[in-house]
């Protein structure tokens, strides 16, 4: 049986409560975006992750960039899983999980 988690260098992503699992595409995309934002000359203090799922992309960005991240997830079980993953990481002070529908979220 496959593991219900992915172990990264600085954090672990559990995914047993999420419909959308960690994939190679997600890891590659997260790495690309985190590097692009980290290497940008733009001053970026806040980021928004809509449909955070496990929290993977927020975690990948948090480890590369010193910014605050709001991560929105509509599914209660996935939001709970993301919260667990974030709290267990060294980046919990940089990421805020919000369980709501992004279509009604007040930006």
Identify what each model region corresponds to:
Residues 1-37:
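Class I SAM-dependent transferase core
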Residues 31-107:
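Conserved SAM/SAH cofactor-binding pocket of Class I
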């Amino acid at each position: 049986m496959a593991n219900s988690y992915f172990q990264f260098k600085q954090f672990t992503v559990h995914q047993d409560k999420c419909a959308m699992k960690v994939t190679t595409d997600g890891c590659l995309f997260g790495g690309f975006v985190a590097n692009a934002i980290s290497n940008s000359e733009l001053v970026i203090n806040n980021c928004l992750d809509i449909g955070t799922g496990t929290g993977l992309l927020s975690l990948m960005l948090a480890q590369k960039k010193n910014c605050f991240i709001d991560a929105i997830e509509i599914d209660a079980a996935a939001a709970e899983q993301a919260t667990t993953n974030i709290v267990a990481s060294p980046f919990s002070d940089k990421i805020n999980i919000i369980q709501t529908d992004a279509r009604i979220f007040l930006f």
